[in-house]
Amino acid sequence: MAERSSNGYKEVPVRQSEESTIAEEEKDTLLEARSYSRRDRKRSRSKAVWFLIALLLLSNIGLLGGLIHYFRKTHHKEKDVPWLPPKTVGRGFVNINNDTALPDQPGLDQSLPHQRAMISVFHQLHCIYMTREGYYAAREGNLDQVNAAHLMHCWDYLRQAIMCHADTTLEWIPAPPNDKGSTGWGVEHTCGDFDAIARWAEDNRLKTTYGIH
């Protein structure tokens, strides 16, 4: 039976070449560990960045949907705003009896005892309505619902109508710093009796349709 030694642990001498090899192995192990650690951190950061991007995209999609809903809701609510043209029965189209000679105008046939016409103010209000509808359709992205040729006609027609009536009411400029112009609100104008015109148009209506479009 082999005898047991009572000697304690002793440091085993290592040759320089072996010490160098061990040091290199330890160094490589540490570098590899650091490399894995950096990769893990990069992966974690990358996942966090992608998560934030996805969260922002979802938030923006939700915001966009909310804005579209708001604009559409606002559009429908604003259909009853006070400036919306009144819906007169007959839409401003009237029958005219040629009892007396009328000035020659485009579309007028003097040989007929009855003539059809549209009262200009209703044409103007119709154009305002079309401009408004085109604006909301474009804002909601429904460009196929915008009749560009009709709008161009309406803008030119309204321009000439405004210049024809040429309202010369004075709109006073406020004191500084609000002296850039005038809102025109509250200023008195000399106006025609639109209610009386609308009643006459309904009494002599050509059509029984209701609306302004």
Swiss-Prot record:
GO terms for cellular component: membrane. GO terms for molecular function: oxidoreductase activity. Residues 1-26 are annotated as: Disordered. Pathway: Mycotoxin biosynthesis. The lineage of its organism: Eukaryota, Fungi, Dikarya, Ascomycota, Pezizomycotina. This is Oxidase ustYa. GO terms for biological process: mycotoxin biosynthetic process. Keywords: Glycoprotein, Membrane, Oxidoreductase, Transmembrane, Transmembrane helix. The 2 HXXHC motifs are conserved in ustYa family proteins and might form active sites.
